[in-house]
Amino acid sequence: MLKEINSQFYRISLSWTRILPNGGNDTINQDGIDYYNNLINELLANDIQPFVTIYHWDLPQVLQETGGWVKDELIDYFLQFARVAFENFGDRVKHWMTFNEINQICEAGYSEGSFAPNIVNKGIGGYECTHRVLLAHAKAYRMYDEEFRPTQNGSVGIAIDTYFHEPRDPNSESDKQAAEVALIMNYGWYANPIMLGNYPEYMIERIRNLSLIEGRNKSRLPEFTPEQVELVKGTYDFLGLNHYSSDLSYFAGPNDGDNPSHWRDVGVQGYQPDEWGQSASGWLRVYPDGLRGILIWIKENYGNPPVLITENGFSDLDGLEDDGRINYIQEYLYATLEAIHEHQCNVIGYTYWSLMDNFEWNTGYTQRFGLYHVNFTDPERTRTPKKSSLVYKNIIDTRHIDWDFEPSKK
């Protein structure tokens, strides 16, 4: 499939338990190492660069049973995992990401309880988890920088997912401020420490004040020590951006009273208007200007770092004539070009999610994002190219968005 569309790289992730079945590096599963070596070598043999994410949400159960990502011990376990990855694959892998989507790991997993490990601890768990994941990322980056970069000469980043938040009313100062607050509290929460060394000042003050009102003697948002500020600051060679959709924002609290939560801390609500094109996912409406907007926002707030779009995609229910996906890809790539050429955003690459239909977390096999259709009822899991795969191939081959391209006519 990758050869058919002439893809230059392939983004894969490592399964922690496939490599370290007990969580730590006391037991290394050679079969797991061999599996990834074979995959990496086959990609390179076909002139496809492997792009490897170390952690994509699959924490070994034995480590979850000790508390998971709200425990400091997880940082050292992750470093063991990262070291094994760098040692075994780093001679050939030149592009790494430490984590995929801290928001889904932490806020969804340890605060809202909507993703594994399904812990509900609103307004606390997500912050505790994020703090440790950021420290784990930073230590892994420093380890690579000091021990592996001199001989392997690769790059290390992290993927942060975000909506772009537009003001509900572009002429309303209140709504414009709400959109900015939403970006600070939802994207800046993760990016600010990596870029500048600490959480956004607005976020620190906001959560501290709300914590005092709640009768607490300290903020629900953990603090970085001065040493940790220096540790975390600048731990990127590029920023990975996962972006699918956007919303229109305005100031309003959640509907759960004064109970602590991240959304109460944010104090902003958002919605997606009906005129935005619909996908098969309730959260994903089509608004290409949002991708351009978040790229510009990153440039203006963080000094125009290299940004690799690591996920961007469209879901439908089934079928091979996926014109909705084609429109999405073309429109979002055009918005990316506008960000590059009109606003000088430092975009270094684009990754479509996903190559083929897959298991989409809580929605299982019911929503399809792939360029290739997978027959999940066939024991062979037959793959069939969708119309979008041919359009995407044409874009790769020509480096041009041909709005009139029709595969059936070529």
Predicted regions and their residues:
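Active-site region of glycoside hydrolase catalytic domains
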Residues: 22-24, 33-410
